[in-house]
C-alpha cells in the first residue's frame, strides 16, 4: 500500500492484493507484490487521477497521518521505519533510471510525482 502511494501506482485495486495458501504449513501468506507500476504517461499533460483504493477514507492527498492511522488499525509494527525504507527506494529508482539511460526529462517528470510521507 505504501509503495503504491510513494511511487504513484494509482491502479492499486483489490485484485492486486492476495494471499497464497501454503499447504505444507497449513497457513496463508501475503503473496509477493505484482502489477505495480507508475500509472501516468510522463510525456503527456495529465490530470492526476485518484487511487483505486482509499487510505483512511481518502483517495487523493494521502498524508503520513492517514497512513499511520491505517497502520494502527492493522497493528503494523514500526510503520515509520517501513515507510522510510520504501521512500529510500526512490534513490535506487533514480540510480536504475540513470543506468538505463532513460531520458532526463522523463525521469524528472516521474520523480516530481513521487510522494514523501516522512
Region annotations inferred by a language model:
Residues 1-14, 18-118:
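Anionic ligand-binding catalytic core segments
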Amino acid at each position: 500500500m505504501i509503495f503504491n502511494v510513494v511511487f504513484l501506482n494509482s491502479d492499486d485495486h483489490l485484485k492486486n492484493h492476495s494471499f497464497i495458501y501454503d499447504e505444507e504449513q497449513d497457513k496463508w501468506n501475503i503473496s509477493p507484490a505484482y502489477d505495480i507500476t507508475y500509472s501516468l504517461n510522463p510525456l503527456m499533460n495529465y490530470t492526476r487521477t485518484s487511487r483505486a483504493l482509499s487510505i483512511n477514507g481518502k483517495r487523493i492527498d494521502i498524508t503520513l497521518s492517514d497512513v499511520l492511522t491505517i497502520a494502527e488499525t492493522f497493528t503494523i509494527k514500526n510503520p515509520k521505519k517501513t515507510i522510510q525504507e520504501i521512500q529510500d527506494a526512490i534513490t535506487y529508482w533514480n540510480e536504475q533510471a540513470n543506468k538505463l539511460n532513460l531520458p532526463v526529462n522523463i525521469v524528472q517528470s516521474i520523480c516530481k510525482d513521487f510522494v514523501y510521507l516522512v
